[in-house]
Amino acid sequence: MTATANDKPQTCAQIIRARRANVETAADAVSLAARTAVLLLFAYLFFSRVFLLAQAPGNDMFPAVKDGDLLIGYRLQRDFSKNDVVVYTAEGERRTGRVLGRASDVITIDGSGTLLVNGTAQAGEIMYPTYPEEGLGYPYTVPDGCVFILGDYRTQSQDSRDFGAIALDDVEAKVITVIRRRSL
């Protein structure tokens, strides 16, 4: 380092301290960048492999889930129970629905709007009648490795009545929380 007329000559100790401070600042920056990268990688893996964040793609589950609501789902569960609300893919589109039948269950939908699973009428909180769609014959036995999914808004939703049973591989996650869009 060269001294100018206005600079005081520096001692060796001062020069060493200044260079050490520069090295420590650079090391701190690298450490911060590495920690940030690890945190971002963890967040990516957490939300791409363990949990699902998705916006409800329509009113298939109205009134329980409305179009635009934020859904938080658990991806690691593969054994779905009846009445679990799930996010699944059918015909290339993400959809939501309620699991009503599992492998070997017999689903019957008659012309009067009655839904039977293994001979038992399904009522619950559903206020819309369930009518069969063309193409799927009833009684229908759910194949192994599949689930039968219906939307709660039965008169407007596309679901297993249209697509048949949904393969477990096409079910992305079980919905564990719904955050209403209007509350954000």
Task: Describe each model-derived feature in a short phrase.
Residues M1-R95, G164-L184:
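Protein maturation boundaries and topogenic segments
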Residues R78-V117, Q122:
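Extracytoplasmic/periplasmic/luminal assembly and interaction segments
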Residues G135-L184:
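Beta-strand-rich cores of mature extracytoplasmic or soluble domains
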Residues F62-P63, Q77, V99, P132, ...:
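Short secondary-structure boundary/capping segments
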Residues L71, V86, I107, V147-F148, ...:
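Generic structural signal for buried aliphatic residues
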Residues D105-D110, T130-G137:
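Short, surface-exposed linear segments at secondary-structure transitions and domain or protein termini
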Residues V117-E134:
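PP2C/PPM family metal-dependent serine/threonine protein phosphatase catalytic domain
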Residues G68, G101, I149-G151:
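Conserved S/T- and glycine-rich ATP-binding loop of Class I adenylate-forming
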